[in-house]
């Protein structure tokens, strides 16, 4: 039984994927419930191959897996932002922990959060634009 290696994305490819997702949002490929219309992965694969002709990224599994991971991170950070004692600093992409006890309680609720503790999330503002159901950004809740 062989194990496949996960594909490592370079930063330029991630930026291109974000750009492609934003273009889909702007061109009515996003449904009111926050999901994308059928065929969006193929559109993104085409976009990636135009911008990075030799990248070899395919809709399945590469693009789908990347977006699924981003959505998990987005949901966890969004939930953390809504909790007292926690927040997000957009300027450097870090999760703020004003109250360590609040963080300990949070990682009991969202087990995925524990692996996100000391990482930076520079694409979070883009994810808000892409994954938020109403498409609005939440600049008023920004903490610095």
Mark where each language-model region is:
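Sequence-specific DNA-binding modules of eukaryotic transcription factors
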Residues: 1-144
């Amino acid at each position: 039984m062989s194990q496949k290696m996960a594909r490592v994305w370079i930063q330029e490819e991630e930026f291109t994927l974000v750009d492609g997702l934003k273009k889909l949002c702007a061109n009515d490929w996003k449904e009111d419930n926050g999901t994308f219309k059928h065929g969006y992965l193929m559109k993104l694969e085409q976009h990636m191959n135009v911008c990075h002709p030799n990248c070899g990224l395919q809709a399945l599994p590469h693009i789908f897996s990347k977006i699924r991971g981003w959505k998990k991170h987005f949901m966890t950070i969004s939930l953390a932002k809504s909790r007292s004692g926690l927040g997000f600093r957009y300027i450097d992409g870090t999760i703020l922990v004003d109250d360590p006890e609040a963080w300990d309680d949070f990682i009991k609720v969202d087990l995925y959060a524990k692996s996100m503790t000391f990482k930076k999330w520079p694409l979070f503002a883009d994810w808000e634009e892409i994954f938020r159901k109403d498409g609005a950004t939440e600049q008023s809740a920004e903490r610095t």
